[in-house]
Amino acid sequence: MNTKDNPKFLRWFNFFSYFIFSSPILVLFFNSVLDNYALSMTIYAAQSISCSLLEIPFGIISDRIGRKNIMVLGAITRLLCFIIWAMSYSFVPLLLGAIIGGASDALASGNNDALLYDSLCDTKQKKSYHKIYARITSYYQFALFMGSLIGAVVAFYSMRLAIILNILPLTVALGLSLVIVEPKCKAAPETSFIRQFVAAIKNLWNNRRLRYVAAGDGLNYGLNESAYSFNSVFISQFVPVWALGIFKSLGHLLNSFGAHLSNRIARKIGIDRTAGYGLVADNFMNIVSVLCNSIWTPIVRLASPLAEGIHSPAINTIVQDEIPNRIRATTLSIASIFGSLCYSGAAIFIGYLADITSPYWALLAAYSIALMVDSLVFVGLKYRSK
């Protein structure tokens, strides 16, 4: 077995990693245990903080000890997180599971994409990265779609059963991580952790194409993801609560379809235009959905995940092409933590604005700012790849 099989295993690894049944009801499960929404949201916050603290250290370690080891450890911790949650009947074990889940997110962030890129480098297929990454994205978005639908049915009978059933696909994902072959196409890392980190920062700053695209993508992620988390409050004015899960599932399905189209569109109009125009379409349709302010809002908003599925693989490919192998995971982790910080700031901004005005104005402001931020990506795309 060699690295040429890695993309195939990565597709199915991502499918089973995201084929979970608790996505639509996780906060409801936490609340069923804790009977307190503030404490329930604390579990989410703990997972986010854990990921943020560990993201850069794990990225540096990945560049030094190898991608496969980090991937296996990430699969183990993700499985352990859900095992602990399945057995939890109080706050402390839920918190412990969240901290371990955050570590799993940090281990996967940057590392798994770097593993794919290095594997394609081994087989001299780097130019196929966009096509293969888009296919992997399509797989895991379809897994989220299927998991959300099945999970909604299972949770109707037992929310804890939905958590327990997650253990099965995550065990399969762990098994798939063990058959991955460590790529050889990886330059020697810097001599120390500090130099590794500094080298990644310098690359981000000195490479103007990478700097602007990564900054625009991180700000877009923060604004759009925080708005997406809050969107249910706005949409619940127009549809019953049970329909929110259906619209969320359809969003994953359309995202999967968009990812399937991404490489085809890039072949026709170029990867830069696919990334830039896709971002604009994503944010524009979000604004239109808010302006509808009616039953049409959740329907129009379904165009957003379709556009996201198209532009996300293109942006990821552009960023990957600008990073040297020796600092790949480190650089991706820095970019990821920037996006997480933007998410935290945007979430506070949206919540505060909703309190003093309304969810309508808060979401309209967030999506409008995101549309303006797209200009950073277009500035970056003007510079040629190094």
Regions found by a protein language model. Name each.
Residues I99-Q141:
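Cytoplasmic helix-loop-helix junction between adjacent transmembrane helices
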Residues S32-V33, W85, L144-L165, V233-V239, ...:
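Transmembrane alpha-helix termini and helix-breaking/packing motifs in multi-pass membrane transporters
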Residues I76-Y89, V280-N293:
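C-terminal ends and interior cores of transmembrane alpha-helices
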